[in-house]
């Protein structure tokens, strides 16, 4: 068997997320069906992360096995051809060792969350960022973010449907940068809880709106209660950027 590692980008707006689900179209299903059309083989695609409906990806990584060798550049061309008309594409493909696993071999995952912060919405960024019309206090958000860095119990920021056995995670990066009318939040960790990034963003926005004091983020973290945290930020602003191995 030959194991292939592919890197994928997609717009999640019209998709039900990464994972295959009955009755709806997912990224996994689109790619598995595309691979079958040119290889004749039924494959199972394993992704490095399971993005939700509406979430985008710039560098999602996945792997699959084929019984015959095909040149990686031809695989890219074939997948992109058969994945049409969906906004899903592969931009890298390479052979990987048989013990490589897109999910379990990962050492870190990186996300970006985009906020358009101006009085009027952006047509260009419709469904690709969270539009917030009121000015956000970015320095306050940056100060609050410091409380979340490191190893903590992130129960307050996990979805009620989260199936992770442990709520202990290590947030290695949480940088907030304002560029003109856009605010970007950069987050990285070995792994994340379900909705963890979006719940963190939703809470930091409350700080940015001066609804919460900076120190309240620390109180929310220590509460270990989802009800203590802010709302879940919209999926449209979230991008799965890359996975490190």
UniProtKB/Swiss-Prot annotation:
Purpose: Formation of pseudouridine at positions 38, 39 and 40 in the anticodon stem and loop of transfer RNAs.
Swiss-Prot/TrEMBL keywords: Isomerase, tRNA processing
Key word Magnesium present: no
Annotated residues for binding of substrate: 111
Pfam families the record matches: PseudoU_synth_1
GO biological process, one term: tRNA pseudouridine synthesis
Catalytic residue list: 52 (nucleophile)
One GO MF term attached to the UniProt entry: RNA binding
Entries under Gene3D superfamilies matching the protein: Pseudouridine synthase I, catalytic domain, C-terminal subdomain (3.30.70.660), Pseudouridine synthase I, catalytic domain, N-terminal subdomain (3.30.70.580)
Record's subunit section: Homodimer.
Enzyme Commission no: 5.4.99.12
Family, as annotated: Belongs to the tRNA pseudouridine synthase TruA family.
Superkingdom of the source species: Bacteria
Reaction(s) catalysed (UniProt annotation): uridine(38/39/40) in tRNA = pseudouridine(38/39/40) in tRNA
Record InterPro entries: PsdUridine_synth_cat_dom_sf (IPR020103), PsdUridine_synth_TruA (IPR001406), PsdUridine_synth_TruA_a/b_dom (IPR020097), PsdUridine_synth_TruA_C (IPR020095), TruA/RsuA/RluB/E/F_N (IPR020094)
Designated name of the protein: tRNA pseudouridine synthase A
Taxonomy of the source species: Bacteria, Pseudomonadati, Pseudomonadota, Alphaproteobacteria, Rickettsiales
HAMAP family: TruA (MF_00171)
